Amino acid sequence: MGALLFDTSIYITALRTGAEGNLNLRQLAAGSPVWLSSVVLEELYAGVNPRDTRVVERLERDFTKAKRVIVPSLNDWALTGKVLARFSSEYDYEEIGKARLTNDALLAMSAGRQGITIVTANQRDFARLAKLRPFSWQLPTGSAD
């Protein structure tokens, strides 16, 4: 299997379930190289409770040391804007909905550029984004969705 990138939804589940959740992240990767997006890192820092800040800091340090952090390029940002414009007209999204999707679209464009598969629990939005600009994504193994 190719490289994987976990969406924020996957890390949040792992943080909420503690050590068992971290073990499940390793099982999800199953020998595949795992990458971290700077977009996901931002979302984690913005939403983490104080007791889990060190876990996020460790993620940042470990992925940076391994040189496996994806940072969106100028082209990723431009493609994100174009995809969100199409998304809005195809799915009748208002401005608030587009703002919520910006990070997901940015994650999709940057991972897609690198040929990295996104693992996410957010099936609805990622399936729609992939119809507008193809990229590889999957639900976590064992997900009911």
Regions found by a protein language model. Give the residues of each.
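Generic structural signal for small/hydrophobic residues in well-ordered secondary structure
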Residues: 7-8, 44, 80, 111, ...
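Short, hinge-like loop/turn segments at secondary-structure boundaries
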Residues: 51-55, 87-88, 136-139
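Active-site neighborhoods of divalent-metal-dependent phosphate/nucleic-acid chemistry enzymes
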Residues: 69-117, 121
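Short, well-structured N-terminal submotif of metal-dependent ribonuclease cores
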Residues: 1-36, 40, 46-64
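Acidic, PIN/NYN-like endoribonuclease modules and their adjacent C-terminal/linker elements
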Residues: 1-3, 108-145
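A short acidic, often aromatic-flanked loop/helix-cap motif at beta-alpha or helix-coil junctions
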Residues: 42-43, 75-79, 142-145
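Alpha-helix capping/helix-boundary segments
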Residues: 10-11, 40, 76, 107, ...
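Alpha-helical elements of the RecA-like P-loop NTPase motor core of helicases
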Residues: 13, 46, 78, 127-128
